[in-house]
Structure formats: structure tokens, C-alpha cells
From Swiss-Prot:
Lineage per the UniProt record: Bacteria, Bacillati, Bacillota, Bacilli, Bacillales
Similarity comment: family membership: Belongs to the vitamin-B12 independent methionine synthase family.
Cofactor(s) the record lists: Zn(2+)
Biological or metabolic pathway of the protein: Amino-acid biosynthesis; L-methionine biosynthesis via de novo pathway; L-methionine from L-homocysteine (MetE route): step 1/1
Keyword hit for DNA damage: no
Species for this entry: Bacillus anthracis (strain CDC 684 / NRRL 3495)
Protein name (database record): 5-methyltetrahydropteroyltriglutamate--homocysteine methyltransferase
Length: 762
């Protein structure tokens, strides 16, 4: 049996974020197109070289991109919306689709399955000419071969996943458009095969959540492609979950190899292999190293997995690979020497994961004795962090054990609470507020940097934050907002800020991952038991409240969002980590309330995106996610108003969960898809406080009062005015002051006009 090492995809951003810097330099005209292309080629080839040096045999080619791999596929297949027709050059069209321009709205962006990466949504239009516009995978395959002598493994997004992720067609059109994709995919694969590609990876992550009818439809497309390209060696790659429900059919697809995720879909895929075996004439590609987290693998567990598989399958060959692309992990841990030894040793970023694949390959081909020293090291590392004081806090254990049913619910139902809150807060009909943050100007960022570098003292920094807070409290009063915020000038990031103030978190210096386009994030590492230390938001919020007679909201990030936007320890269930965060936040909320703060917002923008891919697994996730929010927020008095904020994503999927959160008011980011959301509310009632974003904060445009009034008017057709709030769709941190003030003035005027109309019609 031949066994090879393979990688599914490598991080794009560069060890020092060279990729990001090159992109942004090009966008700001600091480098020209030739310099941009030359630098990008250097980065791309360097990534191939690293994987070659690490000992990976099947090196992915074509996973590199200038923005997003789904956008690459859309451009390649001619899915270019007509509004971009005036652009002529490849890069102009490509980046206009990704980012928009002064006169062109960008294509929509959304989360890549249940990860924290975002892709550009392909758009189908009537009359679209689907064809192979550009065989980019072929160019990159030939480049690696000529420049480095690497016979790589081209990686392409499969036709079924691509079209399922696209928008702009009706369900009735889907089958017809899918058939139109056969010809360009045939041409793409034929040209790759003719150029010498030994194996071509076709990614179909959507296969983890298809119906039986959809799998059959996908199979017919692959049969049509295979008929035209009979000799190409295709690896059908699935990831992010198991394909258990459709495994029996998927293993009959006309492909040479099938890749399965034995990390996030381990139980389901093992069950399926045990029940149905695996075809002897196909290669099984085993996703055995977690491509979505940063922890060293348990090599003993991985080798046990292979022992199990080798007993159950008769396949001629095996491939050892990560569970998914390493796009979701930082590149290399070597710079993280500031971390404690026990934590540093327990980490494995992308380059370390490649080394783990090679170790497993050695054990499988030469016996475990060939890596006996490494196995012993790994066992010691796991034992050290498992038994560390950080992971075994008695106070955290005791708090969890002491939880009772009443800790997860408010004393009174919403209607009665809301009445008490109206009396206590004295807010008008259709109250106005913002989501939390105000512009983080160059001065704000520079002052924070000087403070962190020790150039200015704590006292000087605090005085600066107070000055900014007072300035924006006055702005809000002048604008006429009803519920104010302190502005969050002390915060760099809504998760990092809290992680820095809670026990159990650590932070990397260079642990960057791509979020979307050139935007990179550095997720906190939850490595130990999470616990409250000291007040995190009290000082700034209480100071802001002291400046005004109006109500000031406390602002916190919710437990599920902190969890979903961090790298999370993998030795206990995510539910338990979420409860630990919730208990810490509960303490903070109680402190805010006892300090006189009567409205407290606990944001959960990432609640939906943490949901499992399979609908059958949703209930279990939603149950503990909702319980986490309730645990954090349920100890306050009935008169204290709890708000939450969410980013809109398939509201219908989670409307029951949103109700169960029992927040007094929810604000939802809907400005880009307001019509869809209004339609949803026509047949899905929501009977609690709700604010639908009345303008898009992601655009520098200042919308008119009339535009916002129209949205309020539409919203009031499906929302009870008694419970309706008026707000922007998200925080205003990234906007400029000269954009924010007029936009909020228009919003307040729209609210006043709406109140007048309601009074007239009463």
C-alpha cells in the first residue's frame, strides 16, 4: 500500500503578512500592477517551497488567491455581474467585484460554512455566458513546475459547491445552470491533465449537508464530466463534517480518490466506513490533523485512527492530510516565544501541522518505533498542559457545579419586564440608539499605541479616553439620541479586549489568520479555565453615565461570540468553555447594574455562524448557546434592560433561538438585505423589542433622512411600534466623524417623523 502526504491549502497571508501589505499598497497606488504581480508571485512560490521543504508530497496549487478562492472561481467561469462590464482589465474587474468602487456596489460577502473566513458570493444573472474565461489553475500549476520543479496538485472548487454558494437564480433554474457548468469544468480538467497534473483536488465541502436527491444530482454532473475527461485523476475532497448520511452513494462517484474529514466528522465518517467499507479501486485521503485549530495533534489517537481504518478498508493507497485547508490557522509558532513553555509546546500552527503529517507518514511506513522520541515528547506535552493549574481551577469547577435551573432565566416574562423598564427608563416611542462603538480615529489608535509602548503613562492614556468619551457623549446629546453609549475608545477588538481581562486567555504576537480580503485577525487563545478577575467595563461606562442625564448602555461581547472568535482548548466540550465565559460575564453585568447602569448590551454577532453544518445537530448547539447567554444575563433586576446585537444570517433558521435568548431588545444588521428580512417577519412574528438597522455602516455614504424613514416605515408594517427601536446596523468604529454625525442626525429626524405619523394615525 502506497501512503503519501498531502496538504489541502496553505495560509495566504505570508509569515509577516506580506500578502496583506502588498494588496493594500496596490489598492492605495503605492505600487503599480507589475510590482504587485511580481511580489504576489514571490509569496506564492515561497509558500510552495515551504511545503516542499517540510516534506509534503502532494502540494496544493491554486489555493493561493489575490482576495478569495470563491471569487477566483466566479471570475474563471464568467460569473461577472453586468454592473462591472465597464471595467476591462482582470484586476480592475476582480477587485471591483470584491470591494466595489465609487459607483459600483461590491458583491455580497458571507461566512465560509461555519468558519470565520468570508467568501465573495457568486452572482448569476439572466443571459450570463458561462465559459472558462481564464484557466488560472493551469497557469499556477505550470508556474510551480517551471520555477521550482514541483509537480503540484491543482486545487479547484467543485461545481456543485460553487453553484450552491451562488445567488441570483431560482430553484427551478439550478439544474439547468449546473449542466452549463459541465463544459467549462471539462475544459479546465482536460487542460490540467494534458499539462501533466497527476492528481486534481476538487473541493466539495457542501457534500456534508446535502439531501439524497442533491447527491444524486451531483453524481450525474460528475459522471458527465468523467465521460469527457476519462483519464484525469480526481480527488473528491469533503471537509468540515462527515458525509455519513450519503457516504454509500458518494463512494460510487466516478473519481479516483475521496477525501474525508476524520477530525470534525470523525464519528460519522468512521461509522460510514465501518458499515459500507471503502472501494478497493479508490484512494482514501484521511483528514487526520485539525486544520481549524492551533493545538498539537494527539499522535497516538491519530495512529489508532489509521489502525482502525486499515482493518476496515481494502483501498490500494492512503493519503495523510489535514482535515481542511490550513487557511484557518496561523503560519508558524516560532515567534511566540513570549508564551509560557507549557502553552508554546502545546501549539501547532500551519508549518507545525505539516511536520505532524510527515511524522504520521513515517510511523505508517516505517513503524511507530521510527518516531518513538517524538511520540514520547508529544505525550509529555499533552500531560503537562492537561494537568496545569490553568486548566484545573477549583473555583471555576465549584461555580459550574453550583449552577441551578433558576440561574438560566429572568424572574418575570418579557411583557411584564418591559412595562417596568418603560417606567424606569422613560424612553419615547421608537427610541433611538447606536450599536456601541464610535470612530477610532488615527489619534485614538496612535495614542493607544504610544500607551502600549510605554511612551505615555496610564494616567495620560486614561485622560485621553475620558476626553474622547465626553466629546462623544456631547455629540450624542446634541444629535438627540435616546440611549447613549460611551464609544469603546479603549477597545481594539470586541473579543480581544475581554480576553485580555479574563483568566484563561493568552495572545499570540503573530497568530494572524485571514478573515476576508486583506483583513486579518489575531484570535485569542483560550487555553485554560476562564474566570472573572476585575471589572472590565465599569470605569468607562460609569464615567460616561456621570456626564449625562440620559441613559448610557453598558457594552459587552457575549459568551458565544467570544468562544466562536477564539482558538479554543480542545480537552473539554465547547459548551463548558462557553459556560465559563458566561459566568465571568455574569459577574461583570452584576457590577454594571450595581453601579447604576440600567441598560446593558451583550452582543452575539457570532451566534449563528457557530452552528453545525448538519440540521440534525443544530438543536444541541442552540440549546447550550442560548443557555450561555441566559446564564450571563439572567441575574439582573426586571427593571434592567438587556439588549443584544446580531449580524443577519438566515433569521428563519434561528428565530426560535433568538426568542429563547429572552433579551429585552435585539438589534439586527439588516441594511444590505432589509427587503428579505421584512419578508421573513411577515410570516415569522417576533414579539419582543427589536431594532432593524436603518443604514449600512460599512459604506462611507451618508444616507438621507428619507431613505431611513422609508426603512422605518417598512419595518413598522411587520413590527409592533411599542417594541421597535431605531439604530444603525452595526458599530461605527470604522467610520469617520464627518460621516457619522450627519447620518445619526438623519436617523433621529427619521425617528421623529415616524413618531409624528404614529401619533397622527393613533
Amino acid at each position: 500500500m502506497a501512503i503519501q502526504t498531502s496538504n489541502l491549502g496553505y495560509p495566504r497571508i505570508g509569515l509577516q503578512r506580506e500578502w496583506k501589505k502588498t494588496l493594500e499598497a496596490f489598492w492605495s497606488n503605492k505600487i503599480n500592477e507589475e510590482q504587485f504581480l511580481t511580489t504576489m508571485k514571490e509569496i506564492r512560490l515561497q509558500h510552495v517551497k515551504v511545503q516542499q521543504e517540510k516534506g509534503i508530497e502532494l502540494i496544493p496549487i491554486g489555493d493561493f488567491t489575490y482576495y478569495d478562492h470563491v471569487l477566483d472561481t466566479a471570475y474563471m467561469l464568467g460569473f461577472i455581474p453586468s454592473r462591472f462590464s465597464e471595467f476591462t482589465s482582470y484586476l480592475d474587474v476582480y477587485f471591483a467585484m470584491a470591494r466595489g468602487s465609487k459607483d459600483h456596489v461590491a458583491s455580497e460577502m458571507t461566512k465560509w460554512f461555519n468558519t470565520n473566513y468570508h467568501y465573495i458570493v457568486p452572482e448569476y444573472e439572466e443571459g450570463l455566458q458561462i465559459s472558462l474565461k481564464d484557466n488560472r489553475p493551469l497557469r499556477l500549476y505550470e508556474e510551480a513546475k517551471q520555477e521550482l520543479g514541483v509537480d503540484g496538485k491543482p486545487v479547484i472548487l467543485g461545481p456543485y459547491t460553487f453553484l450552491k454558494l451562488a445567488k441570483g437564480y431560482t430553484q427551478e433554474q439550478f439544474a439547468t445552470i449546473l449542466k452549463q457548468l459541465v463544459a467549462p469544468y471539462v475544459q479546465l480538467l482536460s487542460e490540467l491533465h494534458a499539462a501533466g497534473a497527476q492528481i486534481i483536488q476538487v473541493d466539495e465541502p457542501i457534500f456534508a449537508s446535502l439531501t439524497k436527491e442533491e447527491v444524486q444530482q451531483a453524481k450525474e454532473i460528475y459522471e458527465a464530466i468523467r465521460k469527457e475527461v476519462p483519464n484525469a485523476t480526481l480527488l473528491l475532497q469533503t471537509y468540515f463534517d462527515s458525509v455519513e448520511e450519503n457516504y454509500e452513494e458518494i463512494i460510487t462517484f466516478p473519481v479516483s480518490s475521496i477525501g474525508l474529514d476524520f477530525v470534525h466528522g470523525k464519528e460519522g465518517n468512521l461509522n460510514a466506513v465501518s458499515k459500507y467499507g471503502f472501494p478497493a479501486d479508490k484512494t482514501l485521503a484521511v483528514g487526520c490533523i485539525d486544520g481549524r485549530n492551533i493545538w498539537r495533534a494527539d499522535l497516538d489517537e491519530v495512529l489508532t485512527l489509521f489502525t482502525t481504518l486499515q482493518k476496515q478498508v481494502q483501498t490500494k493507497d492512503l493519503i495523510v492530510q489535514p482535515s481542511c485547508s490550513l487557511l484557518h490557522t496561523p503560519i508558524d509558532k516560532t515567534e511566540e516565544t513570549h508564551l509560557s513553555t507549557e502553552l508554546f509546546d502545546a501549539l501547532a500552527f500551519a508549518n507545525q501541522k505539516l511536520e505532524e503529517l510527515v511524522l504520521i507518514h513515517s510511523a505508517l511506513t516505517q513503524g511507530t518505533e521510527s518516531i518513538s522520541n517524538e511520540l514520547e515528547t508529544y505525550r509529555n506535552v499533552h500531560h503537562t498542559i492537561r494537568s496545569s493549574a490553568a486548566r484545573n481551577r477549583e473555583d471555576v469547577k465549584a461555580a459550574r457545579t453550583a449552577l441551578k435551573e433558576e440561574d438560566f432565566s429572568r424572574p418575570l416574562p418579557f411583557e411584564k419586564r418591559y412595562e417596568l423598564q418603560q417606567v424606569a427608563l422613560k424612553l419615547p416611542l421608537l427610541p433611538t440608539t447606536t450599536i456601541g462603538s464610535f470612530p477610532q480615529t488615527t489619534e485614538v489608535r496612535q495614542t493607544r499605541k504610544e500607551w502600549r509602548n510605554g511612551i505615555i503613562s496610564n494616567e495620560q492614556y486614561e485622560q485621553f479616553i475620558e476626553k474622547e468619551t465626553e466629546k462623544w457623549i456631547r455629540y450624542q446629546e446634541e444629535i438627540g439620541l435616546d440611549v447613549l453609549v460611551h464609544g469603546e475608545f479603549e477597545r481594539t477588538d470586541m473579543v480581544e479586549y475581554f480576553g485580555e481581562r479574563l483568566a484563561g486567555f493568552s495572545f499570540t504576537k503573530n497568530g494572524w489568520v485571514q478573515s476576508y480580503g486583506s483583513r486579518c485577525v489575531k484570535p485569542p487563545v483560550i487555553y485554560g479555565d476562564v474566570a472573572f478577575i476585575n471589572g472590565m467595563t465599569i470605569k468607562e461606562t460609569v464615567y460616561a453615565q456621570s456626564l449625562t442625564e440620559k441613559v448610557v448602555k453598558g457594552m459587552l461581547t457575549g459568551p458565544v461570540t467570544i468562544l466562536n472568535w477564539s482558538f479554543v482548548r480542545n480537552d473539554i466540550p465547547r459548551k463548558e468553555v462557553s459556560y465559563q465565559i458566561a459566568l465571568a460575564l455574569r459577574h461583570e453585568i452584576e457590577l454594571l447594574e450595581s453601579s447604576g447602569i440600567r441598560v446593558i448590551q451583550v452582543d452575539e454577532p457570532a451566534l449563528r455562524e457557530g452552528m453545525p453544518l448538519k440540521e440534525k445537530d443544530w438543536d444541541a448547539y442552540i440549546t447550550w448557546a442560548v443557555q450561555s447567554f441566559l446564564l450571563a444575563t439572567s441575574s439582573v433586576a426586571n427593571e434592567t434592560q438587556i439588549h443584544t446585537h446580531m449580524c443577519y444570517s438566515n433569521f428563519e433558521d434561528i428565530v426560535d433561538a433568538i426568542r429563547a435568548l429572552d433579551a429585552d431588545v435585539i438589534s439586527i444588521e439588516t441594511s444590505r438585505s432589509h427587503g428579505e428580512f421584512i419578508d421573513t417577519l411577515k410570516h415569522t412574528t417576533y414579539e419582543k423589542g427589536i431594532g432593524l438597522g436603518v443604514y449600512d455602516i460599512h459604506s462611507p455614504r451618508v444616507p438621507s433622512k428619507d431613505e431611513m424613514y422609508k426603512i422605518v416605515e417598512q419595518s413598522l408594517q411587520v413590527c409592533d411600534p411599542k417594541y421597535f427601536w431605531i439604530n444603525p446596523d452595526c458599530g461605527l468604529k470604522t467610520r469617520r466623524t464627518e460621516e457619522v454625525i450627519p447620518a445619526l442626525e438623519h436617523m433621529v429626524q427619521a425617528a421623529k417623523d415616524a413618531r409624528s405619523l404614529l401619533k397622527t394615525n393613533a
